[in-house]
Amino acid sequence: MTLKELRRNAHNRLKEQPNISSPELDADLIIMFVLDLKKDELLTKDISVPDALAIEVNAYLNRRLAGMPVQYIVGKTEFMSLDFIVNKNVLIPRQDTEILVETVIERYKNVSEQIRILDIGSGSGCVGISMARYLPNSVVTELDISEEALKVAVLNAEKNLVTKQMNFVCRDIRDGISDLEPKFDVIVSNPPYIKTDDLLELQQEVIEYEPVAALDGGDDGLDFYRIIIKKAVPKKGGMTAFEVGIGQAGDVAGLMFKAGYRNIEIIPDLGGIERVVLGYAA
């Protein structure tokens, strides 16, 4: 079988599943993974594919057809134009979250002193590691309750050449950060914000494969905003920035104002959805 034939067959197989939103892209990612090809090689080469590799491709296609996210199948994804390792212990980074990173970078890119950043609920490390890459004078602490998630973040720091800028802390944020000194210039978080009752309405592949603890924000979706605002305060004049779910920006801004934050901003994403809430500690 030639590479072109393999691609055509793979595309057609995934197109049969209506719940797969990007069948051709997913099929190509699997083929590139199995055959160890780059994108340009996939598009320009028409090599003969050994039967064993074609069988392996079909085995991974079966996993995708069963609902496994393609990012978990190939073990990686792209975020902020960087490559990140992902597995079942971490949420798959979403493009929606890039505006959170971009917002912090934009506000601190001209700061010449060291910038101390705390990323709460770091998961794969995509948020904090991206900031470390694009803010070379930053020192980033990744905090997560999951040891397995932090192991992935450590690998991603190595992969993206920022290990020397990183610290890793395994902790429940409910225990606070008072022992982490000096205080942080920036606290950033993309916390669990889905209402508990709404979890079952998520896509099958999210419910069955991604870690629910990283999604469940309690009855009103705001539990972790309350906890973080209470337990993790940046230094005076420092910034806290959150990603928020649809319709939550006003509530989170209100929580921050009550806690003493000032100059609070709500920032929409490219689709006009209020996606980031930030404020400065008084």
Question: What kind of feature is each model-predicted range?
Answer:
Residues M1-D40, I47-V49:
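Non-catalytic accessory regions of SAM-dependent methyltransferases
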Residues L14, Y108, A157, A232, ...:
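Conserved hydrophobic residues forming the short capping helix/wall of the S-adenosyl-L-methionine
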Residues D219-Y280:
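Conserved Class I SAM-dependent methyltransferase catalytic core
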Residues Y193-D223:
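Mobile active-site "lid"/loop adjacent to the S-adenosyl-L-methionine
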Residues I31-R107:
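Conserved AdoMet
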Residues Q71, I194-D197, G247:
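Active-site beta-alpha loop architecture of Rossmann-like, nucleotide-cofactor-dependent enzymes
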Residues V162, E210, V233-G237:
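Helix-to-beta-strand junctions that scaffold the AdoMet/dcAdoMet cofactor pocket
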Residues D96-E201, R226:
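Conserved SAM/SAH cofactor-binding pocket of Class I
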